[in-house]
């Protein structure tokens, strides 16, 4: 099947309400995962995992506040194309069991994958969401997740490639 205009019309649609619900769950599971993981990781990266839990809590709070806004009820019913990144993003709601003593490299690899999935999803949503507070939120989160991913990549390189793991 060629990927022309016909293919684009076959893509399933979703509402911004559904997007908001999935994103809220994504951030909640990330927060819980990192909070549970923090005492199990090495001291070398514990601060990173604790920061990730705090950041995910902030993102969760932002989504919950958006969901409560009366002025967004109509906007939340807007249909948009489901982003290509949606499946990968949704899959991240299911978190792995990294055991009681996960190694730093495994933790950082997982965190990088999650941040990358979030960055792609929020960027795609930014491009498809009408101007307004929800679009502004997706723009903010796309930038935040990009920043987190870059910071994690630098730390990963420092720890893994300097013999820290």
Where are the predicted features?
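Non-heme di-metal
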Residues: 1-165
């Amino acid at each position: 099947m060629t990927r022309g205009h016909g293919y684009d019309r076959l893509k399933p649609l979703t509402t911004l309400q559904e997007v908001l619900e999935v994103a809220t769950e994504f951030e909640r599971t990330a927060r819980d995962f990192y909070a549970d993981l923090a005492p199990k990781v090495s001291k070398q990266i514990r601060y990173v995992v604790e920061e990730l839990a705090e950041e995910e809590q902030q993102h969760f709070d932002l989504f919950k506040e958006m969901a409560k806004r009366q002025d967004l009820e109509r906007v939340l019913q807007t249909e948009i194309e489901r982003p290509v990144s949606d499946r990968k993003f949704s899959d991240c709601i299911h978190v792995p069991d990294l055991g009681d003593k996960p190694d730093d490299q495994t933790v950082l690899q997982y965190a990088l994958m999650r941040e990358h999935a979030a960055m792609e999803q929020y960027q795609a949503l930014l491009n498809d969401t009408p101007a307004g507070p929800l679009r502004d939120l997706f723009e903010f989160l796309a930038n935040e997740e990009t920043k987190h991913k870059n910071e994690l990549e630098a730390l990963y390189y420092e720890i893994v490639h300097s013999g820290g793991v």
